[in-house]
Amino acid sequence: MEIWNDIYNHFNPVAFSIFGFSVHWYGLMYILALVLALAMAKYLVKKDDIPISSQLLDNYFFWVEIGVILGARLGWVLVYSGEAGYYLTQPWQIFNPMHNGEFIGIRGMSYHGAVVGFLLATILFCKRYKQNAWQLLDLCAICIPFGYTFGRIGNFLNQELFGRVTDVPWAINVFGQPRHPSQLYEAFLEGLVIFVILFLYRKYKKFNGELIALYAILYTFARFICEFYREPDSGLGFIIFGLSMGQILSLIMCGFGIFVYIKLYKRFTKI
């Protein structure tokens, strides 16, 4: 257990360097998450006989990836950075990977911002290619938590988004303080558990859009629990009633999921 407790003292978040640029494990895990999510989508399309071509799915994931990156970064800038004014007056800095002449990559992404970017990209894609948005979103409802699992493991390997100080025996020492490995809690609850639930439930879904609505609700419960073990975002702390920004945004997401579920269910029962 001691080796586990001090894992950060023995693990380098940089996987390797190439031409002087450091490649972090987080970046590799992000790429792995995307590749596996796409592979899962293609598996489900074939397994469940969903009328979507492989080429169209590739195009969709390309659109979505752009939306996710833009949304995640802008969400962090506007909500979490504490320097929104600086970035808005110097927008070129939002995606600038250099700092004082050193390549540091793009740091700071927001999950809920990524969700907004993902939804906008899906809407635009479906209008462009005349696809059923709810059918695509249901497919993503299973693939997202599958890939998300590896994204949170990437956060753990990158030594970021630490948990709160604790005395549990499996705590990770971070700058001399024992903390919850909350990134792994999130990988399990927000990723793996939700994936398994929706993967198994997909055979019983009653209408298109049901899975993505359930995902929004399930994610809220999982994130709400995990936030009690995760250190609040620096500069924000607790917002109201002892809740973090992540919990508040997740509650909004849950409300939207419930609204969508009820609306689509009523439409389904009228058929």
From Swiss-Prot:
Its main location: membrane. A 1,2-diacyl-sn-glycero-3-phospho-(1'-sn-glycerol) binds at residue 152. Pathway: Protein modification; lipoprotein biosynthesis (diacylglyceryl transfer). The keyword Transmembrane applies. It is found in: Cell inner membrane. Keywords: Cell inner membrane, Cell membrane, Membrane, Transferase, Transmembrane, Transmembrane helix. GO terms for cellular component: plasma membrane. GO terms for molecular function: phosphatidylglycerol-prolipoprotein diacylglyceryl transferase activity. Its EC number is 2.5.1.145. GO terms for biological process: lipoprotein biosynthetic process. Pfam families: LGT. The chain crosses the membrane at residues 18-38, 60-80, 103-123, 136-156, 181-201, 209-229, 238-258. It is a multi-pass membrane protein. NCBIfam families: lgt. Catalyzes the transfer of the diacylglyceryl group from phosphatidylglycerol to the sulfhydryl group of the N-terminal cysteine of a prolipoprotein, the first step in the formation of mature lipoproteins. Belongs to the Lgt family. This is Phosphatidylglycerol--prolipoprotein diacylglyceryl transferase. It comes from Campylobacter concisus (strain 13826). The lineage of its organism: Bacteria, Pseudomonadati, Campylobacterota, Epsilonproteobacteria, Campylobacterales.
